[in-house]
Amino acid sequence: KMAFAAGDTVDHKTFGRGRVTKVDGDSLYIKFARTGQTKKLLKDYAPIVKISS
């Protein structure tokens, strides 16, 4: 399992690159660069990889 923290840069299979804005238990709030939208995703199920912290 990967650990995530606010400020981490991630890449999502569908939404592309984004930045973690908040971690709440198993949920990650990620603001995606391409759309400018923030999405709430489950960290153990979302197709994301950490690029940098």
Residue ranges and their predicted role:
Residues 52-53:
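Compositionally biased alpha-helical segments
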Residues 1-14:
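Mixed-charge, Lys/Arg-rich low-complexity intrinsically disordered regions
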Residues 28-48:
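A short macromolecule-binding patch
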Residues 4-5, 24-26:
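A short, compositionally biased
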Residues 16-23:
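Short beta-strand-centered aromatic/proline hotspots
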